[in-house]
């Protein structure tokens, strides 16, 4: 069984669609092994998105991610990384297929409702960033 990280971003939390997004995961055989709601600090967001530090959108991304609470989850299932990415849809909600999380709940390429790990290796690192092993069950 694979594990992947999912973050429900501040825009979706503010809209009150946490439950609807979780339902998408559970309805598609992705089990929630760990979950917490938290407010990222600037330091947290900068460290988590450090891979994008030199990109022009980095400051806006960090500002957005600290603009409100997020819900961080570990999802588990067969092909969890790709299944989660398929459920999320394209990064730009205007390009996301109908019925995907971003098509249904995202506002823009910046406020795009969810984050999901893009590889198994990144999933392991991202999960470890937010959760200790004893928190995952």
Curated annotation (Swiss-Prot):
Q: Where in the cell is the protein located?
A: Cytoplasm
Principal subcellular localization: cytoplasm
One biological process term from GO is: GTP biosynthetic process
Q: Which PROSITE patterns match?
A: NDPK (PS00469), NDPK_LIKE (PS51374)
HAMAP family linked to this entry: NDP_kinase
This chain's function reads: Major role in the synthesis of nucleoside triphosphates other than ATP. The ATP gamma phosphate is transferred to the NDP beta phosphate via a ping-pong mechanism, using a phosphorylated active-site intermediate.
**Protein name according to UniProt:** Nucleoside diphosphate kinase
């Amino acid at each position: 069984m694979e594990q992947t990280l999912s973050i429900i971003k501040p825009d979706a939390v503010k809209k009150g669609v946490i439950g609807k997004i979780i339902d998408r995961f559970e309805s598609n055989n992705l089990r929630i092994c760990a979950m917490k709601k938290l407010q990222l600090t600037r330091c947290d967001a900068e460290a988590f998105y450090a891979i994008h530090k030199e990109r022009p959108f980095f400051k806006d991304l960090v500002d957005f991610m600290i603009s409100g609470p997020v819900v961080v989850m570990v999802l588990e299932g067969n092909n969890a990384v790709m299944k989660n990415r398929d459920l999320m849809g394209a990064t730009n909600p205007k390009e996301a297929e109908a019925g995907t999380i971003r098509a249904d709940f995202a506002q823009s390429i910046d406020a795009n409702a969810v984050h999901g790990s893009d590889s198994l290796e990144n999933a392991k690192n991202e999960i470890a960033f937010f959760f200790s092993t004893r928190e995952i069950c």
